[in-house]
Amino acid sequence: MKDLENLQKLLGYEFENTKLLNEALTHKSTKLPYSNERLEFLGDAVMDLIVGEYLFKKFSKTNEGDMSKLRAALVNEKSFANMARHLQIGEFIHLSTAEANNGGREKASLLSDAFEAVMGAVYLEAGLDKVREIAVRLLEICYPKIDFSHLVKDYKTALQEITQASLGTTPIYELVRSFGPDHKKEFEIALLLNDKEISRAIANSKKEAQQMAAKIALEKMKK
């Protein structure tokens, strides 16, 4: 595992209390007395606020519904995992041997959780302004074009237009199951056309899972 100094250089912030950073990088699989789950919970809330504020200022004439869609496109597992990869967080996470051997350092869920935890740790030690500075810089590096056309992909609407025109029917989305802790629930959605299952997807919200299932269905139709 690399020296934490390298991560702090990439982050653009040097911790006074490196124990806090270590906690943010400790996965529950280590079975240590502490893990990054509490910091992840905090970091999730902080990032939600920062991204919301950023979009509010950047898109002064955009309505609430569209801003919510933009925020959802940026505040999610995939987005946070992308930012974690930019920081090379996977190389610094403390994992059990089994989890590491199972590709844990590349898992989007683990990377996203660790990123949120690191943001939570920065917030605790340095406050909101420092987290905002780091988060906005990472957002603009990882997403150089932050606008509706580049970020918000409404696969459900696209699929519905195609199926109505070609099949005379609309897709049905069914919840297969929900699982995980209350603050990190995941939802599995099945997409059906004429009572036949076409695709399935799992995400952190029903809406995101539906969009992912619609995207998979669209990709199948192109083949």
Curated annotation (Swiss-Prot):
GO terms for cellular component: cytoplasm. It is found in: Cytoplasm. Gene3D superfamilies: 3.30.160.20, Ribonuclease III domain (1.10.1520.10). Disulfide bonds: none annotated. One of its GO terms (biological process) is tRNA processing. Keywords: Cytoplasm, Endonuclease, Hydrolase, Magnesium, Metal-binding, mRNA processing, Nuclease, RNA-binding, rRNA processing, rRNA-binding, tRNA processing. SUPFAM superfamilies: dsRNA-binding domain-like, RNase III domain-like. Residues 4-127 form the RNase III domain. Its cofactor is Mg(2+). One of its GO terms (molecular function) is metal ion binding. Its EC number is 3.1.26.3. Mg(2+) binds at residues 40, 113, 116. It comes from the Bacteria. It catalyses: Endonucleolytic cleavage to 5'-phosphomonoester. PROSITE patterns: DS_RBD, RNASE_3_1, RNASE_3_2. SMART domains: DSRM (SM00358), RIBOc (SM00535). Digests double-stranded RNA. Involved in the processing of primary rRNA transcript to yield the immediate precursors to the large and small rRNAs (23S and 16S). Processes some mRNAs, and tRNAs when they are encoded in the rRNA operon. Processes pre-crRNA and tracrRNA of type II CRISPR loci if present in the organism. Homodimer. Belongs to the ribonuclease III family. This is Ribonuclease 3. It comes from Campylobacter curvus (strain 525.92).
